[in-house]
Amino acid sequence: MMKNKTLSDRYPKGQLVRSRQGRDQNKLYIVTASDDQFLYVANGVKWTVSNPKRKNPLHAQKIN
């Protein structure tokens, strides 16, 4: 039986992602954390590690 991967398994801390939707479309971010529903991402300019952006994982694409 295959286990469902959790959000933190699919997007580990440090994962580079590109925003696919929203006003930040095509911007690059680093995943800083995740919970059951959202990724928390930072770019070091507007969104820092201490104040990350909350992002729907359906609107994020893995880069590496």
Name each model feature, range by range.
Residues 1-13, 20-21, 30-64:
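Ferredoxin-like alpha/beta domains used as RNA- or RNAP-binding modules
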Residues 25-27:
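Short N-terminal binding/cap micro-motifs at the start of the first secondary-structure element
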